[in-house]
Amino acid sequence: MWHNDHMSIEKVSTQLANLPPAWMSRVSGGGGAMGNAAEIRKMLGEPLPQLVDPNSLSKGIAAFFGPRGLLERLRRKLSLISRKKGGKILPAKNTIASVDEDDNLYVGVDFLEQFGEDEDLIAGILAHEWGHMMSDLPRKVDWSHLTWDQLHALRRDEEGDADGFAGRAMFLMGYSPKAMVGFLKEMDRRRKNKKIPCHKYHNHATRAAILMESYEAERRAYNFAKRLFFNENKTPGVKIGRIIGSG
């Protein structure tokens, strides 16, 4: 069963309230070492996207970046899930989305023009970038001694972790990962047609599996926590007492 009723911030808060306290520490554990992840990108020759003047945006695209726009609503939900506020959301070009060491999120204007009506996909893309903010790479580490292959392997692991966070976050926000999986498949098809090698990501099948498995794992954890810690009338306490008493 897909979780498709795109949730308001209040509903996301209710979802989190149905989970035991230990869950949050698991989702938000580590985190905050984005500076090193950004440094690895720089070493691999990946500059930050070029900003677009907000005043040059069409009315429809500008609405995405407004205080009541979709991107801000998603930022609030992801902030609630991760306990990370995030930085500014900035319009950019020649990119889908990216995040920098200050947690500023760059979202591609061309991407929004093409896929702006696909809220599931936009949520998945932002959740993936938010996952980079949760990086557990240690701080103040010099990566310059690593070979190119080692740097690419480290980057693939980072991307896999971000996909895993995205899958979990999409469940909690009420979005289906199907659009994200389909988008990755299409990007992979285009890359292969152009015979462009890709070293920084796992293959499409692996990324799709990470997204789907993490989504389903969060759904199972959520449903199990509801059964374990809450009664049918959604009040806590009695079931916990029974479990402790039966021990």
Predicted feature residues:
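Alpha-helical hydrophobic/aromatic positions enriched in membrane-embedded helices and signal peptides
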Residues: 120-121, 195
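C-terminal capping/extension segments of zinc metalloprotease domains
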Residues: 8-16, 20-60, 66-99, 104, ...
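Short, functionally critical alpha-helical segments immediately adjacent to catalytic or ligand/cofactor-binding
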Residues: 27, 123-128
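Soluble periplasmic/extracytoplasmic beta-strand elements of cell-envelope proteins
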Residues: 104-108, 124-125
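Flexible, glycine-rich surface segments
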Residues: 121-122, 141, 145, 149-153, ...
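Catalytic Zn2+-binding segment of zinc metalloproteases
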Residues: 111, 117-120, 129-145, 172-175
